[in-house]
Amino acid sequence: MHPVEIEQALASIVCLIDTREQPTDALRERVKAIGFPAKRQKLNYGDYSAEITLPRGERVDLSAKFSIERKMSIDEMAACFTSQRERFAREFERAKANGAKIYLLVENASYEKIFGGRYRTKVTPNALAASLFAFMARYDCTPIFCRDESTGRVIREIIYREAKEFLQNL
């Protein structure tokens, strides 16, 4: 694809937001920070992905290629690795079976907080770290930690780069 066509397609990015993301003030602020037009639709895995329009008008849903699974805290992530592990693993297994990449974005988290047990759940730091690293190895999952005020920008950057890589490889 020609660089001009790539730029045209990148200008058409629409952020896809899973319908299970609760319509809160925080979501509205996040969407504003993402900066792309947004569309709510059911995603098979993850909370955010993208859709682009190719130069000839064909819409391409990239949610089968990549998605971003957002967690608002280490505590929410820990629940996904403990009480909700079966459901969470199924979501990652679906993505892996489709060859999709999942970014696990955890707000207000760091490895230092995980290793130091600076969270409110009862899961031990070793168990939580082991689960996170096991998911990374098993599902080729990429964890990203950021402050909640940066989440929209991080999502925007992931979407833009994934869309650009997709277009450059057409």
Regions found by a protein language model. Name each.
Residues M1-A64, D75-L170:
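Non-catalytic C-terminal interaction segments of nucleic acid-processing enzymes
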Residues F66-M72:
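Conserved catalytic cores of phosphodiester-cleaving nucleases, focusing on short active-site segments
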